[in-house]
Structure formats: structure tokens, C-alpha cells
Amino acid sequence: MQEKLQAIVAQAKETIHSVSELVHLDEIRVQYLGKKGELTAMMKTLGQLSAEERPKAGQIINEAKQSVQTFLSEKKAELEDAILAAKLAGETIDVSLPGRGLDTGGLHPVTRTLRRIETIFSKAGFDVATGPEIEDDWHNFEALNIPETHPARAMHDTFYFDENTVLRTHTSGVQIRTMEEKDAPMRIIAPGRVYRCDSDQTHTPMFHQVEGLIIEENTSFAQLRTLIIEFLRQFFEDENLKVRFRPSYFPFTEPSAEVDIATNLFGDGRWIEVLGCGMVHPNVLKNVDVDSEKYTGLAFGLGVERLAMLRYGVTDLRQFFENDLRFLKQFK
């Protein structure tokens, strides 16, 4: 019996060693250790032995079964390791391959421009003030020395809710509200959305504006001129930027001026208007109970989209509001 068991174990070892797939390994287990397996059949022959021989024979058969089970376990572990190694080899990361970057978003060019403007003026001591976009007649017109006969009040220029309520046409109303609520001296800028009945290559019904106000003693137009030139040169990062002031008219400032810069945006070095400014009209100060004998004011207003167009080389203002990602992704 012992010789037969040794032959079975040797054959099992050889067969197991030659297996290359787990499914075949299970077939071999059934062949030797299953209910009808060769070693199981050997156990059934113990009844043919004498009582003295059975313990020794049973021990030998069990040792043979354990040997075969050990071969099977070792081979199974070997095959599983090979399968895992092959899988890992197929999934190896090539660290020399450039990573795939996330498609991150970015600030809208108008937002970037607004933040740039706020940063520059904050360095000059200006606070940021805000106010409602739906404005009453007093804050949008009357307090700013704009009479009922002024063209800006016309229906084709202003969006009316009723005869006394409008979508604000400028952020100057924020200046009025601030002067009503706070005492001079003050320096503020009022950024925000404004609305006018206008739409073409350089105008949209809704756009962004920043208006600035200084109420202090002994202000002068020379101070205003220096402030604006310095702002424009910082904004465009050009210390040699050409800036000119032209006499103009605004109901809420006197004297008033429009400011142009020389630009090659259209390829011809033309002068482009970028903002309006002036000394705050005494009537405006009177309307908000500011002592015009003690204080004088400087005011300016600029279109954010206009500055964004000039800074980024955009020739059609409407592109800022069409939500075309091909356009907007340029400004990340």
C-alpha cells in the first residue's frame, strides 16, 4: 500500500506542477481528493485490513492526502500570484506620461476687470460702496442735478417701471445715498450693473460701471487729473500711456471733461474715450446737505466693459455676454 500511495503522490505532484490554469487545478483536486478520488478510494480499503494494520495504514493515507493538498495550495498560490502580476503589469502607470489636467473654470473678463479697478483705487484710499439697481427718480436724476427736461430721462434711454422708478442708468445714485448717510470727508467707488436702452457693437442694454467720488477740503481739478492719469497707466500697465482731457458737459459736475487714451486696438492709433469726470456741481452737494463752502468734490465714471475691451483687445462688446466658452476660456 505504501508503494502505491507514493506512486499516487508522485503522479499528483507532477500533474499539479504542469498545470497553468486554476480551473485545471480544481479538476486535479477532485481527481485525487474528491469523493471518488484516488486517495479517497484508498481510505475505503482500510476495512480489508486487520485491526492492528488499520491505524498505521490510515496514518499513511492521511499523510499522502496532506501532501497532495499542500501541492495544490502551493500551486494555487503560485497561479494567483502570476495572475495578479500579469494584471498589474497591464495596469502599470507610465510616470513619464504627462498628467491630464482638470478643466478648471476662470473669472469672467468683466469680473477680472472690476477687481483690477477696485484694487487700484483701494490703494488710493477709496472704499467700495453699493446700492440698489432699481432706483427712484430722486437718487437717479433729481439729486444729481438732472432736470425733467434732460434727454437722459427720455423713454428711449431709460427703462421705467413707473414714472418714479427706473432701472438705474448709472451708479451715481450710490454716491448720493452715501453722502446722505455719511459725513464728509470721503472717498468711494461705486461699481455695479447699470441699464440703458441701447444695443450695438459698443453698447449693451446692461453693462457695468464704476463711479468714483471724493468729498474733501481743498480738492482741485489738477488733483482729479493726476488721479485719473495714474489710474489709467496702472490699469493698462503703461507708464507712457497717452491721455487727454476734453471739455464736456455733465449735469452733476462743473467743470466737466471726457478722457481719451491713444490705442492701437483698431490698428490706427486712434483716441478712444474711456471715462468722464469733473468737479462735483454745488447743486449736488446742496441736495445732500454737504457744505459746499467747506468741501468740494471730484467725480468720475467709467465703463468696465470699455476698459476690458481695450485691455484684452476685444472689438465687439457683445462678446462678453454671449456665454461662448471658446471666447471666455481665453481669459483664464
Swiss-Prot record:
Entry similarity comment: Belongs to the class-II aminoacyl-tRNA synthetase family. Phe-tRNA synthetase alpha subunit type 1 subfamily.
Cell location: Cytoplasm
Assembly and interaction partners: Tetramer of two alpha and two beta subunits.
SUPFAM superfamilies from the UniProt entry: Class II aaRS and biotin synthetases, tRNA-binding arm
Chief place of localization: cytoplasm
UniProt-recorded name of the protein: Phenylalanine--tRNA ligase alpha subunit
HAMAP family reported in the protein's UniProt record: Phe_tRNA_synth_alpha1
Classification via Pfam families: Phe_tRNA-synt_N, tRNA-synt_2d
Binding-site list for Mg(2+): E254
Cofactor(s) the record lists: Mg(2+)
Alphabetical UniProt keywords: Aminoacyl-tRNA synthetase, ATP-binding, Cytoplasm, Ligase, Magnesium, Metal-binding, Nucleotide-binding, Protein biosynthesis
Cited PROSITE patterns: AA_TRNA_LIGASE_II
Example GO molecular function: phenylalanine-tRNA ligase activity
PANTHER family for the chain: PHENYLALANINE--TRNA LIGASE, MITOCHONDRIAL (PTHR11538:SF41), PHENYLALANYL-TRNA SYNTHETASE (PTHR11538)
GO cellular component, as recorded: cytoplasm
Keyword ATP-binding among record annotations: yes
EC annotation from Swiss-Prot or TrEMBL: 6.1.1.20
Membrane-spanning ranges: none
